[in-house]
UniProtKB/Swiss-Prot annotation:
Gene3D superfamilies: Putative methyltransferase TM0872, insert domain (1.10.150.170), Vaccinia Virus protein VP39 (3.40.50.150). The gene is rsmH. GO terms for cellular component: cytoplasm. Its EC number is 2.1.1.199. GO terms for molecular function: rRNA (cytosine-N4-)-methyltransferase activity. S-adenosyl-L-methionine binds at G47, G48, H49, D66, F93, D108, Q115. Belongs to the methyltransferase superfamily. RsmH family. Its main location: cytoplasm. This is Ribosomal RNA small subunit methyltransferase H.
C-alpha cells in the first residue's frame, strides 16, 4: 500500500552512486518501452536514481519501495515535483508484488550515508550510538540482542560467514567474555573498541577499521540481507516486461557473487555485464563510499517463466 507515514522534515541527505552507469542502459531501451513504462526502485533511499530517471524520461512512472521511514520521507520530498507519477510504498522488497510489470527494476544494496552518519541508527563504529543496526527501526532484533542471544561458536561462525573476518573466533570470544563480565555494551564505540583489541597493535590503524567486517556481519544478520537478496533475485525477473532491465548495485563480495550467479544462471535473464561496472576515479574522489560499488545489468528474455529460473 502507498505510504501514509511520510514526514517531509527528514534530514536525510544521500549522494547516490553510479548514476550515469544506471541511466545509460535505461536510455538505450526501445522507445516503446519508455512510453508510459514503470520503474520499480526496490531500495528507494533518498530517491536519487529514481529522480534522475524520471527527469530524463518524462513518460516513465515510479513505484519506490523502502522499509526505512526516514528514507521514505526524504524521497517523498525529493520526488514531489513529479506528482502522481510517483508512488512510495512502505515495505521490504521481499514482501512486494507489483500489479503490473515494469520496464526497469533496480536495487542499490548499500547502506546509505544518512544511515551511517546518524549515531542513533547504530550502523557506524565511528559514531557512538546504540547497538541497533535495523533498517526498519520498528521491527526485529537489534544487534545488541543478537550478540546476547547467540552462543560463542554461533557468533564466530556468523562473523566469519557474513564478514569474512579471519579473526572471528577471537572476536566472538572477546564479545561473549565482555557480556558475561560487564553486561551489554554501552554502544557501538564500545563494541568497536573490543573488536579492535583482538587485532595486533600494528593492524589497528590501517585504512580499513578493524571493526568493519564484524559490523558488516552483524548488520547483514540483523536485517537478513543475504536471504532477502536471494529472494529478490528470484522474484525480480518476473516483475519485468520482456526486454525490461534489471540493475543491481552491490557493495561487498557476498552480494556481488549472488548477483553474478543469478544473472548468469537464470534462464529468464540475459546477462548484459560480464564484469561489473565500477565508479570512476572522479566519482570516487567526490564520493569515497562509491569505491566499493559494483553494478550489474540483465535483460528480461521473452517467453521465459519462473520455472526457467534456478
Amino acid at each position: 500500500m502507498p505510504d501514509s507515514s511520510i514526514n517531509s522534515d527528514s534530514g536525510f541527505k544521500h549522494l547516490s552512486v553510479m548514476e550515469d552507469a544506471v541511466s545509460q542502459p535505461v536510455a538505450a531501451l526501445p522507445a516503446e518501452l519508455l512510453v508510459g513504462g514503470l520503474i520499480i526502485d526496490a531500495t528507494l533511499g533518498g530517491g536519487g536514481h529514481s529522480a534522475l530517471l524520471l527527469e530524463r524520461h518524462p513518460d516513465l512512472r515510479l513505484i519506490g519501495l523502502d522499509q526505512d521511514p526516514t528514507a521514505r520521507a526524504a524521497a517523498a520530498e525529493r520526488l514531489a515535483l513529479f506528482g502522481d507519477r510517483v508512488t512510495i510504498v512502505a515495505t521490504n522488497f521481499v514482501d512486494f508484488s507489483p500489479a503490473e510489470p515494469a520496464v526497469v527494476v533496480m536495487a542499490d544494496l548499500g547502506v546509505s550515508s544518512p544511515q551511517l552518519d546518524v549515531a542513533q541508527r547504530g550502523f557506524s563504529f565511528r559514531l557512538d550510538g546504540p547497538l541497533d543496526m535495523r533498517m526498519n527501526p520498528q521491527v526485529g532484533e537489534t544487534a545488541a540482542e543478537l550478540i546476547g542471544r547467540l552462543e560463542e561458536t554461533e557468533l564466530a561462525d556468523l562473523i566469519y560467514a557474513y564478514g569474512e573476518e579471519r579473526l572471528s573466533r577471537r572476536i566472538a570470544r572477546r564479545i561473549k567474555h565482555d557480556l558475561a563480565e560487564q553486561g551489554p555494551y554501552a554502544g557501538t564505540a564500545a563494541l568497536a573498541y573490543a573488536v579492535a583489541g583482538c587485532y595486533p597493535p600494528k593492524a589497528r590503524h590501517g585504512r580499513i577499521h578493524p571493526a568493519t567486517r564484524t559490523f558488516q556481519a552483524l548488520r547483514i544478520a540483523v536485517n537478513n540481507e543475504l536471504d532477502a537478496l536471494d529472494r529478490f533475485l528470484q522474484k525480480a525477473p518476473d516483475w519485468l516486461v520482456p526486454g525490461g532491465l534489471l540493475a543491481v548495485i552491490s557493495f561487498h563480495s557476498l552480494e556481488d557473487r549472488r548477483v553474478k550467479t543469478a544473472f548468469l544462471r537464470d534462464q529468464r535473464l540475459e546477462r548484459l555485464t560480464r564484469k561489473p561496472l565500477v565508479a570512476s576515479e572522479m566519482e570516487i574522489a567526490a564520493n569515497p563510499r562509491s569505491r566499493s560499488a559494483k553494478c550489474r545489468f540483465a535483460r528480461r528474455l521473452p517467453q521465459a517463466t519462473t520455472a526457467d529460473a534456478l
